[in-house]
Amino acid sequence: MKLYTKISSGKFKGKRLELPSLSTTRSTKSIVKESFFNVIRDEIYSLTFIEGFGGSGVMASEAVSNGAREAIAIEKDRAAFKITQNNLASLECSNLKAINGDSFSVLPDIINSQSGKVLLYLDPPFDIRAGFDDIYEKLVNLISQLKKEKIYMIVFEHNSDFKFSDEIFAFKLVKFKKFGATSLSYFQ
């Protein structure tokens, strides 16, 4: 049985997107998604939105729906990537694309190739995939490779049991919001 989610706001509001297998991805809860876009909605227009660990591509789709200049969803799992590709294609939107790759490997080059600023949304599969026990340490190492002048904001969706430092290299924590077992940490 296939599972679906819907785009909750913007020009694609109500469009249905397929969700990949729950054994390989974990979809962002509606309340988290809604809160995030309420926070950044007025700031997203000139930005490229990059969704690391894309899953279904719903956050990238929602970003373009809400006016992002461009959105990119990166997904490593092949089956999930196929679903992401199909979801993005169904929106018939030229400024929305999917990349099959490991976010830890491809993100620095993708960000550095952007002409404008990037809003980076990182939602790793922290409680799903084997080998992700040290996911937050890997994320901090990834951030060390990014050029501050290319980044408008980095937002982590993470397990509420984990708390990021108030500073990660050149980026400072500017907002934190908890939603039960899931939290969002915003860095600029």
Identify the function of each model-found stretch.
Residues 111-172, 178:
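S-adenosylmethionine
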Residues 97-99, 174-177:
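General small-molecule cofactor/ligand-binding pocket signal
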Residues 70-75:
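Conserved SAM-binding motif I beta-strand of class I
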Residues 1-66, 77, 82-115:
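S-adenosyl-L-methionine
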Residues 54, 78, 105, 126, ...:
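Short, glycine/acidic-enriched loop or turn micro-motifs at the edges of active sites
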Residues 175-188:
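Core SAM-dependent methyltransferase catalytic element
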